[in-house]
Amino acid sequence: MKKMLMILILILWSFSIPAQAQELKTPVHLRIAAQDLGSAWYVYGASFGKLWRNVLPKGSTIDVLPFGGAPANSLLIEKGDADLAFSFTAIANWAVQGKVAYTKRINVLTGLVGALDRYYLAAIATKRSGITSLEDLAKKKLPVRLVSQPVGSSGEFSMRLLLEAYGMTYEAIKSWGGSVTPTSTGVAQSQMIDGKADIWIQVVTAGHPAVSELALSTDLNFLPTGENVIQKMAEYGYEKTVLPANVFKGQDKEVPLVGFPTILIAHKDLKSEVAHLLTRTIIENKKELVKAHSGFKDFLPEEAWRFDQYAIPLHPGAEKYYREKGMMK
């Protein structure tokens, strides 16, 4: 009788083990496309890797690729050079739709975890320039000196779209006697400090280190995005958002802007049980993630499944987890 009872207990116990724990017996080798060493996304990738190594089978490896960036990361997945990648909602949507930064549709992308943080498309002017709005800049055709991120980056594409929404182009600004210089974060910051640039248009987080440092040495105006421009930018997947007051020195008022969250995407051929486990581990460890990087304080696990609004298909393994948790009906 006791023997039969023990057998019954073992059978019931085996059914209680999550499916992915039973199926994942062999090591998993994953590559996650992030960004340069020291970037927020590289830290994100390292943080995820640390959590995943604790739950994946012994011998599993996770390589965080120290290159890429939002537009490039989708291509790395398509080429088979990465299994996972960070992107922004708008830019992943461009990849799926084959527009803006992409000449054709990328059909292998799926979503795992969204709403990881909050990025803002900020236009930051030095006070000495006297510029208080991009609308004023367009109307007066001022010979402004603009800096942004390198060509092909999310920041440079975003600057181009933002200027176009205000009726400006790079060529027009140059014809007014101004300049447009896509460059590195360090060079852009230095040019703003040295008075060689008037406006820096950049995709930033709240408390972005380079902008925070700039605000300590240079008086700045954080230019608001007009409501009509916000609506135009929405056509490209940007969301209406607000930079809270006092995030940066001298920025004592809320600033209406557009922006987007970081998302984790994966190749559609990633095994379902792996996708399930990776998703579960991130969703259930927000506290640990916040310890690793402050950007995760804006992570919204309850919204992480909402890829439908960006026309990005959800990976079946991730969808299974969200339905099990009652997040999706």
Walk through the language-model features, giving the residues of each:
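Pocket-lining segment of extracytoplasmic ligand-binding domains
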Residues: T89-I91, K99-A101, G111, A125, ...
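Sec/Tat signal peptide C-region and signal peptidase I cleavage site
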Residues: I17-A21
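Bacterial N-terminal signal peptides
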Residues: M6-F15
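Bilobed "Venus flytrap"/periplasmic-binding protein-like clamshell domains
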Residues: P27-V55, S60-V64, L121-D194, D308-G317
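Positively charged n-region of N-terminal signal peptides that target proteins for export
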Residues: M1-M4
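An extracytoplasmic/periplasmic, membrane-proximal ligand-sensing/linker region
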Residues: D194, I199, V204-L216, F222, ...
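Ligand-binding clefts/hinges and TM-proximal coupling segments of bilobed small-molecule sensing domains
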Residues: A138-L161, K240-D308
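N-terminal segment of the mature folded domain
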Residues: N73-Y120
